């Protein structure tokens, strides 16, 4: 889990627009966040395998 202070800091509007960054809505992780879902790769994989994201499933070929 991310520190509460870092999550609060990310929610504030930055002084310069290029400083804004995305965080996972579930765990607050700052890296590898999918913008379409607002989730990091770890949470996305977990929720997809549990069937909590409609239309998303694990690929197999």
Swiss-Prot record:
Tell me the cofactor note.
Binds 1 zinc ion per subunit.
Cofactors named for this entry: Zn(2+)
Q: Name one GO biological process term.
A: translation
Q: Where is the signal peptide?
A: none
Q: Name one GO molecular function term.
A: zinc ion binding
State the UniProt keywords alphabetically. Answer: Metal-binding, Ribonucleoprotein, Ribosomal protein, RNA-binding, rRNA-binding, Zinc
- Residues bound to Zn(2+) are 24, 27, 40, 43
Can you list the GO cellular component terms from the UniProt entry? cytoplasm; small ribosomal subunit
Q: What does this protein do?
A: Binds 16S rRNA, required for the assembly of 30S particles and may also be responsible for determining the conformation of the 16S rRNA at the A site.
Q: Quaternary arrangement and interactors, per the entry?
A: Part of the 30S ribosomal subunit. Contacts proteins S3 and S10.
What is the similarity comment for this entry? Belongs to the universal ribosomal protein uS14 family. Zinc-binding uS14 subfamily.
Protein name according to UniProt: Small ribosomal subunit protein uS14
Q: Please tell me the species this chain comes from.
A: Helicobacter pylori (strain J99 / ATCC 700824) (Campylobacter pylori J99)
């Amino acid at each position: 889990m991310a520190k509460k202070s870092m999550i609060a800091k990310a929610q504030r509007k930055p002084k310069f627009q290029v400083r804004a960054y995305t965080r996972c809505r579930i765990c607050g992780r700052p890296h590898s966040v999918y913008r379409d879902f607002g989730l990091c790769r770890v949470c996305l994989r977990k929720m997809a395998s549990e069937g909590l994201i409609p239309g998303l499933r694990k690929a197999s070929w």
